[in-house]
Amino acid sequence: SFAYVPIMQSIAQDADVGTILGAQIVGGIVAIIVGIFIKQIRHLFPPLVTGTVVFAIGLSLYPTAVNYMAGGAGSADYGSWQNWLVAIITLAVVTGLNHFGKGFLKLSSVLIGIIVGYVVALGFGMVDFSSVLTAKWVQFPQPMHFGIKFEPSSCVAIAVLFAISSIQAIGDFSATTTGGMDRMPTDEELSGGIIGYGVSNIVCAFFSGLPTATYSQNVGIVSSTKVVAKRVFGIAAMIMLVAGIMP
């Protein structure tokens, strides 16, 4: 999740990826604790609070987004007009389809924007297929490739973010069940979702995966389609797993 990027960049400069992964495990444990006691603390986080948290997280990502639009830190052509043109075209397509599109076009606005941006970048010769051509068809992740280290200050910083993201999850789950099922989530549903969020991040750390979140952008898709069947999300998860081992 981009919500962790600023903190992870700071940790990476002073330490390494293994330190981030160790802190991620601690953060996952914090999320599990929040999930276990969600029934007792839920009243402390009304929609006004959770909505504000989601909004604040979104605002904090603008510097990272602008940096990526310029080409990414360390890029030889950082800030070039080609980078900005590709970024602006992609942004315009996503925004236009999201606001004015209907049905499939609206739901697929991000995917279509990526495809359009990719085609434009291809025209500028900004796409290098050499790594794709040399990559194996199937490649499994190596557990603990970067190792796992526990550094107190890093653990505290990431743990705080996980606690905040757990509160964001309350807002995400509430908006999802309201939009998809016309009701608020039960305490058991919130607890299971947040505990699952924590467990998945702990497992993810052992496979060198960086922190994830509950992703507010998916709320709109569920609200629009009303699709909440576990089978659908299970199939989507399997597709992602297969994509993960086919770089």
Regions inferred by a protein language model and the residue ranges of each:
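Short, non-helical or kinked segments that cap or interrupt transmembrane helices
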Residues: 1-2, 43-52, 105-112, 210-218, ...
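Early transmembrane hairpin of solute transport permeases
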Residues: 1-85, 225, 246
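Hydrophobic alpha-helical transmembrane segments
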Residues: 5, 17-25, 84-89, 107, ...
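Hydrophobic core segments of alpha-helical transmembrane domains in multi-pass membrane transport
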Residues: 6, 27-35, 52-66, 84-100, ...
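Interfacial segments of multi-pass membrane proteins
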Residues: 9-12, 98, 218-233, 238-244
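C-terminal ends of transmembrane helices
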Residues: 30-43, 94-103, 170-179, 216-224
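Helix-loop-helix hairpins and the membrane-proximal interhelical loops
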Residues: 75-77, 106-191
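Membrane-embedded helical hairpins/re-entrant loop segments and their flanking transmembrane helices
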Residues: 159-230
